Amino acid sequence: MDNLCHCKGSLISGKVFDNSFERGCPEAFRVNDLIEGFQMALCNMHIGDHCEVSIPWQKGYGKRSDADIPGYSTLIFEIQLLGIA
């Protein structure tokens, strides 16, 4: 099942690493493909809900680092659930 969402992801420092609101194009996600903290947030949302969640590193990307997200990062997501297909 896909969830159609707008989301803005940032580090606790405020550095934005993803923003579908700004792009004007929502994204479709399979819940099982998402980090655990994002899954937990979506499971508590209804279509049309808009929320901001703070995800600790243990429920995010963990120890892994990449170019945009250092390991052990707390993540802040602004999420708007647009639909479920």
Language-model regions, residue ranges each:
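A beta-strand/beta-hairpin structural motif
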Residues: L11-I76, G83-A85
